[in-house]
Amino acid sequence: FSTLWLSGYYKTLEKTSTNYSALRRDMNTVKQNVNAQNAVIRTINNEKKKGDRSEGHFGATGFIVSPNGYVVTNYHVVKDADSVHLQNTRGESYRAEVIYIDPKNDLAMLHISDSTFKALKSVPYTFKAADSELGEDVYTIGFPRDEVVYGQGYLSSRTGYAGDTTAYQLSIPVNPGNSGGPVLDSRGQVIGIISGKQTGIDGVSFAIKTEALLRSISAIPSDSLESKLSISRKNLLSGLKRTDQIKKIQDYVYLVKVY
């Protein structure tokens, strides 16, 4: 079984506001996790009896951070999950284990545990730790539907909801299912991860900064990793047209199905 390690307490002040909506399907707001401080280390596995599986499922987005099957998404996406499956743009589905959660930053690391999964080629994008510039052109791809959807916009604030310094505010239209999707700049660098939007105002969305993701990855205990987690250092997207960038990225972005 894969152990879930709690690295902090899920920030709920802004996330519980009626003006903030998390973006996993079938969920309008992130419920306040009042028991996070006392949360028990849990195991999410794929061996529960069929009768124990909760009825229905919801979906979100995740993307590859290491070609050997490590995928990042939001903590609120996998919270309380019995099992997790990842589906690529070709419709192939794989079992995944939640190996690490970072409730404070609303991040979760998954590992594809399915024996049919084959390691991918080099991840085409890199991860930008430094803050991006106000007004910078950005885009995301994710799964608000069962097929991948592209959205574009710009960075409208260097802080997120309620002045959160670990997040950006973006002017990108997003919908339930976009949670966990990558936010990239024109050079093909991941600058953040979609996490929510402001209700009542069209096009105002929020993304966790890549810096928080990199800190979270560094905090993963080595004994919880099935194999080495290697972040891409070579960018294969810089200088390409946007359409060509998307073609290279889409095989690394997954529909996250949570049961």
Please provide the spans of the model-predicted regions.
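Conserved active-site neighborhood of the chymotrypsin/trypsin-like protease fold
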Residues: 67-149, 163-167, 176, 223-235, ...
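Conserved hydrophobic positions within beta-strands
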Residues: 62-64, 96-98, 155
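Single-pass membrane-anchoring alpha-helices
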Residues: 1-15
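Short beta->alpha transition motifs characteristic of CBS
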Residues: 74-79, 151, 157, 176, ...
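Coiled-coil termination/hinge junctions
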Residues: 41-65
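Short, small/polar residue-rich loop motifs at catalytic or cofactor-binding pockets
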Residues: 57-59, 80, 175-179
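C-terminal cap/linker of serine protease catalytic domains
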Residues: 14-43, 47-50, 118, 193-259
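Catalytic nucleophile loop of clan PA
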Residues: 174-194
